[in-house]
């Protein structure tokens, strides 16, 4: 009887892993048609740099703080699947008031302060409802995919990335067309409604996905203050501190790349889309390779490699102003920069998430993910706030505006954080030794065709 039950459980887990791939594709519609275009929408509604910094970063902090509610829900025995599909359903509904704000702005000329405040409120609610899902979903997926985490999520993220890229490209074409006929708001209505449909499908799939039995045990619970006190002695605590500080550094500049392109570089929506598509495209190609590498050599090895690449990206963005008189060269240069960005972020995002699965026990997964996200959210908010205040300074030197200061400060702090924190963190599982000389030797023996073949090879089929 036990054997039959085990076989049924394994079948349901495999089926759930396949549903999760489709759910990820639906999420890509939300991301590519919706979330990626919130900053351009805010600019259309007249928000300044400081407000945009708050718009992008404050919801991240609020969304992570409300994850403490998730822990309470789990403690009360509410199923992880219920938390996930209800949270995503409520998140879906927030697109209607966000669209309504634009309609009020363009049809009734309502005060900009009221519109900006409304956008912050409803976008914050959208992120909060999504944030509540995070710890429950991570714990849930940890039970479904107990082995080869890197390989599975490398493949899943590739599917999400492909959907996101196609969605972004389509959204860019829609916005460019309606801007050309002097109706940009109509374009945003269309892409946000498609984002709504994507998240609605995602929510429905989460409701169908199998959830293994889970009974939270109070002896595994610890407060956030207990967690903070143990950070100096805890390897996981040091890892959380590193990622949170990196998010602080990243969010000094992250909310303003769109502003930099649309204002300083005077890009149209299609040019903006081509540049912003590059990183998720490279992500899609490289995540499976990073997943295989991490499964063999450890997640921390990838974090160290990519963590030292991240400081270069905003510094290279600053140099784009020198190509402003050569638009084609400027586009090619930024595509190169975003290719490097995709290389770094593909590995960093995948392995920082997967490190948690290696470092944390099943019983403590939800609580550790919640605390991890809270630290990240606080870092994001403080970074975005500081970046926004600097970006609105009346600074101009040669071709450099205050946004250039924001980018350079972000680069400097990223470098400092990686240099100081990475040596303090250790790998948490047995992995193969990585020899840089051997890696260089193997790479030198590969032709460009070989490299493309490796990148295009699937990283394993989650159905098997």
What are these regions (language model features)?
Residues 39-44, 72-76, 99-109, 164-186, ...:
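Transmembrane alpha-helix termini and helix-breaking/packing motifs in multi-pass membrane transporters
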Residues 75-93, 183, 296-310, 398-401:
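Cytoplasmic membrane-interface "Motif A"-like loop-to-helix N-cap segments
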Residues 2-65, 70, 74, 81-87, ...:
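Helix-loop boundary and gating motifs at the non-cytosolic
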